[in-house]
Amino acid sequence: MDYLPIFLKLRDLPCLIVGGGEVAVRKLGLLLDAGAAVTVIAASAEAVIVELADRGLIRLRTKVFEATDSEGFRLIIAATDDRAVNAAVATAARRHGIPVNVVDCPDLCDFIFPAIIDRSPVLVAVSTGGASPVLARQLRTRIETCIPSRFGTLARLAADLRERVRQAIPEPRARRHFWERTLEGPAAELALQGRAEDAERVLLEAADAAARQERPAWGSVALVGAGPGDPDLLTLRALRLIQEADVIVYDRLVSAEILALARRDARRIYAGKERSRHSIPQDDINALLANLAAEGNRVVRLKGGDPFIFGRGGEEIETLMACGIPFQVVPGITAASGCAAYAGIPLTHRAHAHACVFVAGHLKDGTLQDLDWSQLVQPHQTVVVYMGLQGLPQICAELIRHGAPPSRPAALIQQGTTRDQKVLTATLETLPDKVADAGIKAPTLIIIGEVVGLRKKLAWYRSRQETEGRSGNG
């Protein structure tokens, strides 16, 4: 280990930066974040440094550095573009026993700056010992995705309530077990959502229950949008909740790759629906979610796309609210957005479509339900049809019957955003026969409008079939 990783308290301590360029500005920001009293010495300085000096936030000395300028500081940074000046700063600092950092010159450094993940008061520092700052930044980026943005809120909550929890649970081992459970429970999740007051209430209720040696109600439900298929399109919160879940209740649009992200010991319950054949009635799904949470489980209700766009998420949270079950909703990339993007079809375009309409195209008793055809045939808009595969012939026929030109472009996307994506482009008149000849199966999405014609020049994603030379682009 070439460097000892430590965190240095610099609040109100005098620190010196020599240099006034962009690098100096970056180092200045770090020192100010740490509360240091900063002096900058530079022959000329960036406007932001001058502004900070004018506001009295730093001291700026416009001059050439001299060895005597280093006296009286607790930490010095050399950030000029002149190697000789930087070396002189390092020599002067060492003569006075002051730790010095020379930017981009590890051999002259007493300390180095790591890549920082700041979730104050939680800080994570990553360093390669100066070997490769770029590699350190890349590693920081990976770690960033693992630490929720409001992790500091959770840390502050634990700090603020630490003494009250100690009084409620005086026995150290019991208190440690309490914190281990709590920092992965509903109170923690509320804090990570930014709901600090609710988190405090739930945490104190749990502490009181633990003091009485009662089992607290730890369960909760998260309605999570799994996106259109590609696992890389999951949100960071969705990924975290999937990996933390005790039980996952999922539908048929959730891919095996996404389910594989869950813990191995997580219970998986299939609740998919295929046309009118439901594996579990919706009312039973609603009750199942509430019952699983009441048993103390962290439940993820995992839905393809977005839970509030043709996902019946509203019905499920009504039941949870009625039962007093803590819940949250995590939006996902809906199929319309994801599939259109991967097919190279913009849903809006200044020259072609000023509006976009989402409709459900599933059949009930062999007929389409309650669609406003006069609105759907209007020009300069894009119509996106979910669940429309079986009703495609009727949808196209009704649009033509109500005034849409038979030549209006239309596309059907099968398994959008996945390696097996297939895109068929045609017109309202020809798409049904083309789909029938291709043997298309669900899940699919239908896009109707002039924007479909842009696919010829905007298509960028190549599925496995297209890569092998069997493109479905018509």
UniProtKB/Swiss-Prot annotation:
One of its GO terms (biological process) is cobalamin biosynthetic process. The keyword Signal does not apply. Residues 219-474 are annotated as: Uroporphyrinogen-III C-methyltransferase. The active site is at D251, K273. It comes from Methylococcus capsulatus (strain ATCC 33009 / NCIMB 11132 / Bath). SUPFAM superfamilies: NAD(P)-binding Rossmann-fold domains, Siroheme synthase middle domains-like, Tetrapyrrole methylase. In the N-terminal section; belongs to the precorrin-2 dehydrogenase / sirohydrochlorin ferrochelatase family. Residues 1-203 are annotated as: Precorrin-2 dehydrogenase /sirohydrochlorin ferrochelatase. Keywords: Cobalamin biosynthesis, Lyase, Methyltransferase, Multifunctional enzyme, NAD, Oxidoreductase, Porphyrin biosynthesis, S-adenosyl-L-methionine, Transferase. The gene is cysG. Pathway: Cofactor biosynthesis; adenosylcobalamin biosynthesis; precorrin-2 from uroporphyrinogen III: step 1/1; Cofactor biosynthesis; adenosylcobalamin biosynthesis; sirohydrochlorin from precorrin-2: step 1/1; Porphyrin-containing compound metabolism; siroheme biosynthesis; precorrin-2 from uroporphyrinogen III: step 1/1; Porphyrin-containing compound metabolism; siroheme biosynthesis; siroheme from sirohydrochlorin: step 1/1. This is Siroheme synthase. PROSITE patterns: SUMT_1 (PS00839), SUMT_2 (PS00840). Then it catalyzes the NAD-dependent ring dehydrogenation of precorrin-2 to yield sirohydrochlorin. Finally, it catalyzes the ferrochelation of sirohydrochlorin to yield siroheme. S-adenosyl-L-methionine binds at P228, G304, G305, D306, I309, T334, A335, M387, G416. NAD(+) binds at E22, V23, A43, S44. It holds the Pfam family CysG_dimeriser. Signal peptide: none annotated. It catalyses: uroporphyrinogen III + 2 S-adenosyl-L-methionine = precorrin-2 + 2 S-adenosyl-L-homocysteine + H(+); precorrin-2 + NAD(+) = sirohydrochlorin + NADH + 2 H(+); siroheme + 2 H(+) = sirohydrochlorin + Fe(2+).
